[in-house]
């Protein structure tokens, strides 16, 4: 059997063993996708004992490509809601994540001085304990630049392998422990997160208001500032027994009932100006109007603003709200349409059908993946991650790497949505398949590489003490910040799990957090919110520690 065939076969075996381990649950808790790492360690041990030789170049390519696939699909998934989340809760999340990095660095420094751990070993333990491969590479590079002998630099890789498994287990254990301590109901947490997911952090509501302000009598809707802005949509007007779709030129009269869509604060302001809320139904049932959800799939309208399509004027149809990647938005005229946007239309059946034809509404297109944008995005992400950033006083240039670059590029492209006929929408099923494939490939190789010398170092060397040091570096920051975030900041549990996973730049932990409630995007969103800054800090922290320890040691 050729080296390539043998390598592929072993990787498949690792995936099977690891996924089986991940599916084993104790009291409802399992390793999930993280089991693949331990499958790799087990198989790697026996492969080493059997004297098999695998293609190291192929393993390296598979490991990096798997990581790229995982972070890219995460970025595409959360991109549309990432920047809105950053505005609403990003500062708080990033402050907690930075605190985890700082505490981890302090624990590492204390262990280095107390137990006189060699510099390459303690840096490897630090990188493995926070499950950050780019930190390992950055640390090895600066050690070489500082003149450290190569045999000492290689020790960093072994100590990394010792600490890495508990780095993953530690964060999973922390999530489980916090869930038990605070008696978390995951379903309730998911519902609470869902209720706060909008552009401005407040749920989109509807309200029926009676026109009671005499100053508004015989005014056109376009002449009433609160109704002519982008914060509130007036989607229906009822006068006596007649229900119709209002246009900007529609004249309102005292006693008219208006159906308004917007955020609670804006609707409250509308009440103060227009009149009181009423319980009268403005349902389209029994009328010649209907409400329908239509999806944007026509390439000709991508990137166009809602106001430029003139649906009110041409078809007498109102867009009452817009759903983008699960986030409900007020359909203001300045919003540009993206592929996959879901619009709520109100109008007559024939008019809605005409607007649906303009928008596309081709459901089958939602199941298709444009592969050209996928590889354009990955390519641009790799280029971004390869750009060196030179900082005065640092002997090695800083880079985002193959994990940070594709993630940030995917966030940007996911937010842009489309450029011309290229769109970065990816069906959820395809996104999940690529994401799971990527993380399985990545962890399989990491496990295989760690498995060969893992048992020998663990039994006959200093492996146990290294694991103990790594456990402290992993657990102390996570538990401390987790308790603070829940008790002081009242942070949503799923959001907190994503933040903890992101602070460790730990894809398996994110996969575990996602599986806590598969339909909630809370963990993925908070993970992506803190990941870019944390990745940068994780890359420079070992370099800072190396320079600090080298100068004082």
UniProtKB/Swiss-Prot annotation:
UniProt-annotated location(s): Cell membrane
Name of this protein: Putative transport protein YidE
Keywords: Cell membrane, Membrane, Repeat, Transmembrane, Transmembrane helix, Transport
GO cellular component: plasma membrane
Family, similarity comment: Belongs to the AAE transporter (TC 2.A.81) family. YidE subfamily.
Keyword Acetylation included in the entry's annotation: no
Listed NCBIfam families: PRK03818.1 (NF003007), YidE_YbjL_dupl (TIGR01625)
One biological process term in Gene Ontology: potassium ion transport
GO MF annotation terms: monoatomic cation transmembrane transporter activity
The keyword Isomerase appears for this protein: no
RCK C-terminal domain span: 191-276, 279-361
Source organism superkingdom: Bacteria
UniProt cross-references to PROSITE patterns, sorted A to Z: RCK_C
Protein's membrane topology: Multi-pass membrane protein
Entry's transmembrane regions: 4-24, 28-48, 65-85, 95-115, 158-178, 371-391, 393-413, 439-459, 464-484, 493-513, 533-553
């Amino acid at each position: 059997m050729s080296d390539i065939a043998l390598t592929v076969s072993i990787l498949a075996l690792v995936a099977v063993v690891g996924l089986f381990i991940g599916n084993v649950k104790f009291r409802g808790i399992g390793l999930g996708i993280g089991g693949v790492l331990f499958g790799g360690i087990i198989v790697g041990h026996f492969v080493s004992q059997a004297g098999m030789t695998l293609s190291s170049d192929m393993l390296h390519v598979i490991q990096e490509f798997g990581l790229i696939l995982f972070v890219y699909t995460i970025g595409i998934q959360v991109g549309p809601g990432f920047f809105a989340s950053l505005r609403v809760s990003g500062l708080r999340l990033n402050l907690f994540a930075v605190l985890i990095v700082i505490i981890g660095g302090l624990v590492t420094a204390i262990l280095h001085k107390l137990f006189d751990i060699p510099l390459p070993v303690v840096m490897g333990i630090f990188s493995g304990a926070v499950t950050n491969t780019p930190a390992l590479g950055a640390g090895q590079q600066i050690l070489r630049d500082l003149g450290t002998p190569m045999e000492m630099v290689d020790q960093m890789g072994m100590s990394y392998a010792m600490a890495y498994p508990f780095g993953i287990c530690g964060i999973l254990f922390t999530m489980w422990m916090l869930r038990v301590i605070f008696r978390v109901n995951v379903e309730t947490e998911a519902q609470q997160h869902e209720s706060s997911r909008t552009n401005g952090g407040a749920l989109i509501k509807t309200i029926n208001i009676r026109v009671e302000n005499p100053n508004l009598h015989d005014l056109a809707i376009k002449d009433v500032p609160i109704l002519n802005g982008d914060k509130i949509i007036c989607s229906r007007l009822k006068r006596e027994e007649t229900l119709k779709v209002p246009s900007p030129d529609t004249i309102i009269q005292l006693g008219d009932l208006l159906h308004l869509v917007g955020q609670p604060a804006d609707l409250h302001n509308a009440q103060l100006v227009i009149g009181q809320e009423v319980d009268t139904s403005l349902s389209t049932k029994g009328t010649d109007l209907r409400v329908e959800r239509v999806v944007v799939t026509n390439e000709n309208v991508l990137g166009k603003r809602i106001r430029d399509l003139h649906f009110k004027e041409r078809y007498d149809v109102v867009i009452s709200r817009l759903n983008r990647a699960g986030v409900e938005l007020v359909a203001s005229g300045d919003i540009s349409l993206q592929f996959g946007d879901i619009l709520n239309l109100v109008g007559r059946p024939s008019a809605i059908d005409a607007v649906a034809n303009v928008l596309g509404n081709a459901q089958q297109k939602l199941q298709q993946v444009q592969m050209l944008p996928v590889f354009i995005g990955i390519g641009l992400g790799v280029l971004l991650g390869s750009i060196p950033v030179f900082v005065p006083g640092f002997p090695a240039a800083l880079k985002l790497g193959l994990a940070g670059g594709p993630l940030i590029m995917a966030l940007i492209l996911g937010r842009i949505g489309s450029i011309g006929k290229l769109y970065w929408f990816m069906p959820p099923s395809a996104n999940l398949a690529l994401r799971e494939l990527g993380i399985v490939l990545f962890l399989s190789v990491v496990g295989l590489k760690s498995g060969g010398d893992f048992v020998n170092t663990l039994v006959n060397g200093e492996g146990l003490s290294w694991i103990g040091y790594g456990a402290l570096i992993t657990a102390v920051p996570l538990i401390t910040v987790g308790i603070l975030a829940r008790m002081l900041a009242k942070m949503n549990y799923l959001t907190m799990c994503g933040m903890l996973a992101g602070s460790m730049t730990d894809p398996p932990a994110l996969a575990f957090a996602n599986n806590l409630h598969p339909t909630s995007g809370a963990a993925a969103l908070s993970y992506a919110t803190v990941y870019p800054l944390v990745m940068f800090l994780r890359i420079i922290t070992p370099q800072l520690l190396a320079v600090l320890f080298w100068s004082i040691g």
